[in-house]
Every structure is written in structure tokens, then in C-alpha cells.
Amino acid sequence: MRVVLFAVLIASPLVAQEVAVPTASAADAPICTDRPTKSNFACTVPKGLFQIESDGLTWLTNNSGGTRSDQLLFTNPTFKYGLGDSSDIQINWVPFTRIRSRNAAGTVSTLSGIGDVTVRFKQRLTSPDGAFQLAILPFVKLPTARAGIGNGKLEGGVAVPINISVPGGWTVTLGPQLDVLADADGQGRHAGFTGLINIARQFGNFTLYNEIWTSQNFDPAGTVQQYSYDVSLAWLPRPTMQFDVGANVGLNRNTPDLVGYVGISTRF
């Protein structure tokens, strides 16, 4: 199994020197997040507002070659700030994770520590009122995790979130993403591709998501292909807060068998 944590880059736009003051309409709009599931959305945090999106707890399990691995992430927060009417900056960091492995002989090993830092910049390219939404999302991963949790390499890429609203409360999301990844031997870099299709249906304050996801890692030592089916449910008890729960089911041997999580997002 190969688990790759992607992180994100800031492309620094020109920002006015005065302090941003959110408008009443922006502050009253329902929260829009890049969770649950693996998809990103074209929406951005309103100018001058902060937003936090985080797993409360994530559990990952995988069986491969006679070895079972379980990983726990104790929160996985993303901090966002609205830079303008159509752009925001985002920082993601795993403050603590624990990996427990047991091989076929019954030997157990445990590894724990912090994760990598991901920095992202999102620029929405379309009007927020249209049925078609498009954004560009460059990112970079900063290697802050210890060996065994991260690969110790600077990596990055660019995602292009695409959202299409369909009558009846449906939303279709596409998520093409190009990645620049470190070679497994640490001697160079290569390309990767991530793609997904996500279909969501809103029921009042609840939204149900179904998603098919793939990652294609074109490492010179051998291409690593991952596929998963992801399902989740989000609930908005009020316009500035969201709770969610979800599961990702691996569809091939290179993908973790099961990932389960609960999360919360809030804006202020």
C-alpha cells in the first residue's frame, strides 16, 4: 500500500492593504466547504472571513501481503481565510497521527507523530450565481512529517474543481488534478493524476454524496493505481456550521480497504 498525502500551494495574489470587512450578504450565506469526500468545490470563503474544516477522527485500515495496517488521525484541520470576493488561502496540517502495523508473523509496530503541511490557494473563475462553477487550486505539500508517515519530499500540483448544479437539488462535481510527485527512490520527480466524479443530492439541511475516485501515480519504478467508492452525509444545523460523516471503500489492492471519518466545519 502506498498512501500519498497531497498538500497545497499558495499563489500570492495582490491583496489590498486595508483590513477586509465582510459584507452582510457574504456573512449570511450558507457555509460552503471542500468536505466531505475527496472532492473540492469551486466556492471560496467570503472576503474577510475565517473558516475551519476538520475531521474529528479518521480511521484507515488496509490488508496487503499478510500485513494489516491501521491509521488514526486525531483531527485534520484546514484553516481558510477569504482574501477577496473570489479567492481564499488554505493551510492544512495533521497535528497527530498514529500508524499500527501487524505482519503475518504477528509482529506489531507503531509509529506516531505530526503530518505534512498543505498550503493551497483557490481562485474561483466563474460567477457565484451560475449553474456552472469553475476554480483553479494550486497547492504544495511541505514535508514536516517524520519518515514512515510522510516521504520527506516537497510535492505539489494543481486541481480544477468543477461544479454543475442540476434542477431538483442535484450537484455534479468533477475533480481533475495534476500532481508533481517525488520518485520512490528519492532521485527525481514524476507526474501523477487524480480524478473523480461526485453526485450530490440535497434534502433540506442534509446533503448525500456519492463519489468514484482514482489516483494514478506514474512512478518510474511502476505505476500505482488507486480507486475508491466514497459516500458521505453532511448536515447544516445553521448557515455557518456543518457536520459530516463518511466512508471511503477501496476498490483495488493499492487502495486502503476502508476509511471512516466524522467532521465539522464552521465559519466566523
Positions of PLM-derived features:
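Sec/Tat signal peptide C-region and signal peptidase I cleavage site
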Residues: 12-16
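Transmembrane beta-barrel domains of Gram-negative outer membranes and organellar outer membranes
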Residues: 17-268
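Sec-dependent signal peptide recognition
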Residues: 1-7
